[in-house]
Amino acid sequence: MEQFHGTTIVSVRRGDKVALGGDGQVTLGNIVMKGGARKVRRIYNNQVLVGFAGGTADAFSLLDRFEAKLEKHQGNLTRAAVELAKDWRTDRMLRRLEAMLITADATTTLVITGNGDVLDPEGGICAIGSGGAYAQAAARALVENTDLSPREIVEKSLGIAGDMCIYTNHNRIIETIE
């Protein structure tokens, strides 16, 4: 059976502000199943942003586990991400999950990959999902050549990804921490 997939999640950090946004499209094979899915959320007393891409059920499973780690480590984003990655590498069930997360708080942005790696993005810009490369390239160009806010950059980057990637639409949800 085919999995639900396809999305774009992008994060931009500039100064003391961070924005994380995603589109709303969910596809099953070549069929759009939903156009308004919410793949970006606030967790841990609204102090942490998280966006997910990949198989929907897998992403929700990882999100639940990440939230539990965040609670256990009292909101320490890096510690929670590393502990989740350790579990991901050692737990047979988790190793089969096909999803990625971008997490951000007031000071740190991290990508948690499908291999159980934790990456600190270079330049405060990261993107995942089917339109991630388009969004990341657009965000990098905008960061280097404009004075736009992180929210504006995320919005424009998602728009460009939505124009180019058939698995990404223009229904955007963007969250910020300032």
From Swiss-Prot:
InterPro entries: ATP-dep_Prtase_HsIV_su, Ntn_hydrolases_N, Proteasome_sua/b, Proteasome_suB-type
Protein name (Swiss-Prot/TrEMBL): ATP-dependent protease subunit HslV
Gene3D superfamilies: Glutamine Phosphoribosylpyrophosphate, subunit 1, domain 1
Keywords of this entry: Allosteric enzyme, Cytoplasm, Hydrolase, Metal-binding, Protease, Sodium, Threonine protease
A Pfam cross-reference name: Proteasome
Broad class of the protein's primary localization: cytoplasm
Residue positions binding Na(+): G162, C165, T168
Reactions listed under catalytic activity: ATP-dependent cleavage of peptide bonds with broad specificity
Catalytic residues in the record: T7
Organism of derivation: Burkholderia cenocepacia (strain ATCC BAA-245 / DSM 16553 / LMG 16656 / NCTC 13227 / J2315 / CF5610) (Burkholderia cepacia (strain J2315))
NCBIfam families xrefs: ATP_dep_HslV, PRK05456.1
Protein location: Cytoplasm
SUPFAM superfamilies recorded: N-terminal nucleophile aminohydrolases (Ntn hydrolases)
GO MF term list: metal ion binding; threonine-type endopeptidase activity
